[in-house]
Amino acid sequence: MSTNVAKARVKSVLNESRQIERAAVLIRMGARMQVLESETTLSYERLIRLYKEIAGKSPSKGQLPFSTDWFLTWQENIHSSLFLNIYEYLSKGLDLDAVELLIRAYRLYDEQVTTTAIAPLLSFTRAWRLVKFVDAGMLTRTRCARCGGQFVTELYESRHFICGLCHPPARAGKSRVAGALMLH
């Protein structure tokens, strides 16, 4: 019987170690406390200590935004759509748990955006929230009638949807803000 107890302790120590490593990765990627609490089994107090140790500061306070609107505005939609397409592609080809899939997809999104010298508009926490909105059926992907790309839209978007790249808003591309797309 003592062998079973020893195995159980080893399993729990290994599991806790995995949870700490997962939380550390999420913190380094900029995840907010709500993400850490949702995606790990560590206590709130433990997460706070880990966050302070890794980030060197206390975590941001306050609620996460609970609105799909951010993902539907012009530039944010382009970034959200790029991330979600990467996420969906990886989910079909890799057998990973949801958090590992999110981490890999976000790293690829970040890599793609930064290689084009554009600042990523989509934070890791917003990417997590986007996946939650899609899983809850609040957002989906719709094919653009012109270019054929898949873009984040509300659930019942028109079949004749035209994306923000094919039909940008009138003032699009005029901003000099970091991360802004410049249209020529």
Swiss-Prot record:
Entry keyword annotation includes Cytoplasm: yes
Classification via Pfam families: FlhC (PF05280)
TM annotation in the entry: none
Manner of cofactor binding, per the entry note: Binds 1 zinc ion per subunit.
Keyword entries, A-Z: Activator, Bacterial flagellum biogenesis, Cytoplasm, DNA-binding, Metal-binding, Transcription, Transcription regulation, Zinc
MF terms in GO: DNA binding; zinc ion binding
GO cellular component assignments: cytoplasm
GO biological process terms held by the UniProt record: bacterial-type flagellum organization; positive regulation of DNA-templated transcription; regulation of bacterial-type flagellum assembly
Domain of life (superkingdom): Bacteria
UniProt main location, coarse: cytoplasm
Cystine crosslinks: none
Record: residues binding Zn(2+): 144, 147, 163, 166
Cofactor: Zn(2+)
Assembly and interaction partners: Heterohexamer composed of two FlhC and four FlhD subunits. Each FlhC binds a FlhD dimer, forming a heterotrimer, and a hexamer assembles by dimerization of two heterotrimers.
HAMAP family: FhlC
Family designation: Belongs to the FlhC family.
Protein name per its UniProtKB record: Flagellar transcriptional regulator FlhC
The species this protein was found in: Verminephrobacter eiseniae (strain EF01-2)
Gene: flhC
